[in-house]
Structures are given as structure tokens and as C-alpha cells.
Amino acid sequence: MPKGDGKLIAQNKKARHDYSIIDTMEAGMVLQGTEIKSIRNSRINLKDGFVRIRNGEAFLHNVHISPYEQGNIFNHDPLRTRKLLLHKKQISRLETETKNTGVTIVPLKVYIRDGYAKVLIGLAKGKKSYDKREDLKRKDVDRQIDRTLKNFSR
């Protein structure tokens, strides 16, 4: 999480597996009352989420926030599109990055900082299947090295 301490609510582990993250930035979310209550209960899924920029504004798509259990007829739509709060310079930079190169914007983490729900978004480039296999092999080798060093030091 960037600067400051916040309570981590959800993490998109699949994003780091499917994409190589180039850059990250923090954005606020425009939410309804029942949505923030569900987020505080960790009822959010970032797995298929992505960010699209339209008319100079950033929107979060395909992020599932479960309906609030104590909500009534005013409960929210779980998959609705949510606006992200970013500075104009940040939005224009994201827009140029996504138009020129083959990168996309994915949500990485959702956390609450100072009472506000924040999302950490990342500029991501898709990995090929051989890159994914290579990363898994590298992690496995690192784990084995750590294990042998731990046993050797005893």
C-alpha cells in the first residue's frame, strides 16, 4: 500500500500472475452507502475488474461488491460501473499509456485509509504463458534456496 497505513480489504492476486505491473497509483472510489458497508465487511471481488477511461474520467468495471445483508430495496447493483477519483494529469497519463502501448489498467488492492475506500490500480502488460511458467519456476527455486539456508543455519 502506498504511504500511510490502511486496512487491507481485498487483493487481486490473479493480476500479478496474469500481468506484469509497470506502475501503480492510488484512486478514490465513488460509492453508495450500502457499497461501503459491504466493503467494510470484505465483501468485494476484484478478480475480473479493469479500468476504462471515458470522456476524461476513469471508471472501474466488473468489480463485484456483494449486496449489503441488512440493506433493503435501496441496495446497490453488485456489478455496477464505479467512477474513480483521480487528478486530471493522472487520467491523461493513463489514457496515453493505454492508447499507445498494449497495456491495460487493473485494480490490485482495495483498502480503507482515513475512513475512505481506496483502490490501488496498476498499469499492466499481459504476460505470455511461458512467462508465467518462468515466474513459477523462479519462485519455486527461491523457496528451495530459502528452505535449504534455513535448514543449514540450524
Swiss-Prot record:
The keyword RNA-binding applies. GO terms for molecular function: RNA binding. Keywords: Cytoplasm, RNA-binding. It is found in: Cytoplasm. GO terms for biological process: trans-translation. The keyword RNA-binding applies. It comes from the Bacteria. GO terms for cellular component: cytosol. CDD domains: SmpB. InterPro entries: SmpB, SsrA-bd_prot, SsrA-bd_prot_CS. Required for rescue of stalled ribosomes mediated by trans-translation. Binds to transfer-messenger RNA (tmRNA), required for stable association of tmRNA with ribosomes. tmRNA and SmpB together mimic tRNA shape, replacing the anticodon stem-loop with SmpB. tmRNA is encoded by the ssrA gene; the 2 termini fold to resemble tRNA(Ala) and it encodes a 'tag peptide', a short internal open reading frame. During trans-translation Ala-aminoacylated tmRNA acts like a tRNA, entering the A-site of stalled ribosomes, displacing the stalled mRNA. Belongs to the SmpB family. This is SsrA-binding protein.
